Amino acid sequence: MRCRFFLVLCLSSLFVSALGDEKATSARFESIKSQPLKLRHFLSTMPKGGDLHSHLSGAIYAESYLAWAAQDDKCIDLSSLVLTSGPCESGEELKPVKEFFPGGPQDVDDLLVRVVDALSVRDYNLRGLSGHQQFFSTFSRFYQASAGRLGDMLAEVTDRAARQNIGYLELMHSPGMIAASIEAERKSDLTLPFGQRVSHPAIRQIAKRAMAEIDEMEKRRSSLQACNLKNGGASGCSVAVRYLAQVIRTWRPEQVYAQTLLAFMLMELDDRVVGLNFVAPEDHPVSLRDYSRHMNFIKELSQKFEGSNRNIALHAGELSLGLVPPEHLGWHIRDAVEIAGAKRIGHGIDISYDPQMYATLGKMRQREVAVEIN
């Protein structure tokens, strides 16, 4: 009896202590929320749980891509400011990245400023571009710099997450998606029955190679962060990472189907791949034309892969008036939830255009569908 009383007393003390901490934290926040410097420090030190909406390639700073490109003898196309693989042929519009990064004479520094701006969203508003245009234009420019650097990228984002007191990252990544698309180009027919539209054995082999790619990038991350040291390595080692298989929605229907099939196979085969997402501009003509078809791809494959976790997170409703004709507004979120069975919606800014907005929101609440606002 005395032991039980002591346990109750301890638990009560912990509850009172936690309640006191919560009140003190709330009071501190209220006192500094109009003071940007103190507020930033308060929020940076606050534990934040997980970041559920993060594109691995989009989370890397331009300067990191340039450093790797310089080390790997990559080039910059001076007309398009696109990073390319070497060699940099003399007399062409290709310049070795190592000649201007990390900097030097004034003319070199001027080029560096232009390149960093082109590879990021820095100062985009000064160039007469929308953030939307600039953001989506950067991926093709820095793509070549990411080749062979996936582990370095993983180390960078986990180190940064640790500094921000984020303990979990769910990274959108596309292992094997290009290979699946090439396989669909080689042989596919969406009019055939399930199992015959693309080669399932070929896609399964791609999935196994994709798993090996994840193994390699995680091994490289661990090495860079010295995570195997007895006394612990970099703080980024403590950040748990899982992946969303990232399907590129702007390609031909057969290719998107093959990618979606690959995503479900990865979810089935590898516990590190906890779901899928569709990426690339939702306002792209192909994305708009095939949107309903894509949702039905997910629906069908969810039913066929009942043993997998089937966690669907979708960019949906990332649209606004002026970006697309009004006929494309107000139904993408609804279809993502009702047809594809999405458990999370990315952005979802066009919800107010849905004529059935309250019914859609009610269904999302009932199904506990989260909205990723970032």
Task: For each feature predicted by the language model, list its residue ranges.
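Bacterial N-terminal signal peptides that target proteins for export
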Residues: M1-F6
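Metal-cofactor-binding active-site regions of metalloenzymes
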Residues: L19-I373
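Bacterial N-terminal signal peptides
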Residues: L7-L14
